[in-house]
């Protein structure tokens, strides 16, 4: 009879079996969490109540029931030493009891999970693709986790991360592959191509994106900033863009950053944005002092933006010669020389100048009748004309002193120079 009734019983489907297993797994997981909470609660209450009871009993015994004899006191304090050990043993028993329950629960949970895994493997082998996909998405925990951790779609909005300095623009991928045309349909309409320059399509706030013809844009990939440029048919390789002229300050700043900006006088409110003149892109923020005089190259379109103003330059200082200054100071510090020293130095200078004039002017004839005093005066005048303007006054003073000495000592200048006379005769 049992076999007959067993034939009439309907067999549970795979979905129903998985649902029952899933319910049992959830019940066991809830029981495990409840068991852990109950264990912590029981152990905590045991320690709390036993501690309060222990302190209260010690206080009562010490105030009212403490005997005077030493042996009686020792016998009275023995239970107080044994009480903490008893409480500790009770706590150990409670933890052991709950741990055993947790182990049994975990074993049952592992068995149910293994059964579910076997059933899912059978589903993947026996059921159709659509049914197996639905069952796996509903009961397989691995597929659930993978679905939850799936990254957002490329078409969704991309949120900017805090502290991101350079905006990365991603071009939208366009499917430009033509649809297969039916035989009844005519050829696709020809789109006239204008001979003018191609228009630039740009996103708001970003650089213009160059449009590419359908024949060339089928293999175009979006190029991120800071990465090596990708080769595009018909277009050359572009080097990676230059860095920003000035960094872009992050929007989210902490309290410490705001305090430092307030003390230093720096921050977004004290800076000016560097906007490219060609693509109107943001290239960082410059200080007020350097905004008018800074020139930068755009990090997106490589356009060189000149400075608005030229920085004023200070006038060039005259060159300073330390040796010349020493000569001037030495000449000003030297006082009038004595008559004897002036005479000797003047005679030596006259002799040297006369010899130089004779050697340079060999073709000229010299007059023997001219006295030696006049010749020395002429040489002194020539030498004074070639000296610097600062020493003119000093030479005049020396000439006056020489004239005075000549008047007092007639024999020194009236004696003719035999060498000079001989040279003049030979020249004649």
Swiss-Prot record:
Cytoplasmic compartment residues: 2-45, 99-428
Highest taxon above the source species: Eukaryota
Start-end of Pro residues biased regions: 185-198
Subcellular location, record wording: Endoplasmic reticulum membrane
GO cellular component terms listed in the entry, alphabetical order: endoplasmic reticulum membrane; endoplasmic reticulum tubular network membrane
Keyword Metal-binding on entry: yes
Topology class, membrane: Multi-pass membrane protein
Lipidation positions, renumbered (N-myristoyl glycine): 2
Residue numbers bearing the Phosphoserine modification: 114, 153, 177, 182, 194, 217, 227, 321, 353, 384, 414
Main location as per UniProt: endoplasmic reticulum
Region spans: Disordered: 143-248, 361-428
GO terms for MF: identical protein binding; zinc ion binding
Sequence positions bearing Phosphothreonine: 211, 213
Residues in coiled coil: 16-43, 102-128
Free-text description of this protein's post-translational modifications in UniProt: Myristoylated; myristoylation is necessary for the endoplasmic reticulum (ER) three-way ER tubular junction formation, but is not required neither for membrane translocation, membrane topology formation, nor for the specific localization to ER membranes. Phosphorylated. Phosphorylation occurs at Ser-177, Ser-182, Ser-217, Ser-227, Ser-321 and Ser-384 during interphase. Phosphorylation occurs at Ser-114, Ser-153, Ser-194, Thr-211 and Ser-353 during mitosis; these phosphorylations reduce both its homodimerization and the ER three-way tubular junction formation.
Residues exposed to the Lumenal side: 67-77
Feature: compositional bias, Acidic residues: 386-401
Domain comment, as recorded: The transmembrane domain 1 and 2 function as a signal-anchor and stop-transfer sequence, respectively, generating a double-spanning integral membrane protein with a N- and C-terminal cytoplasmic orientation. Transmembrane domain 1 and 2 are probably sufficient to mediate membrane translocation and topology formation in a N-myristoylation-independent manner. Transmembrane domain 2 is sufficient to block the protein secretion pathway. The two coiled-coil domains are necessary for its endoplasmic reticulum (ER) three-way tubular junction localization.
PANTHER family, A to Z: ENDOPLASMIC RETICULUM JUNCTION FORMATION PROTEIN LUNAPARK
Role, per record: Endoplasmic reticulum (ER)-shaping membrane protein that plays a role in determining ER morphology. Involved in the stabilization of nascent three-way ER tubular junctions within the ER network. May also play a role as a curvature-stabilizing protein within three-way ER tubular junction network. May be involved in limb and central nervous system development.
Sequence similarity: Belongs to the lunapark family.
Subunit: Homodimer; homodimerization requires the C4-type zinc finger motif and decreases during mitosis in a phosphorylation-dependent manner.
UniProt name for this protein: Endoplasmic reticulum junction formation protein lunapark
Gene for this chain: LNPK
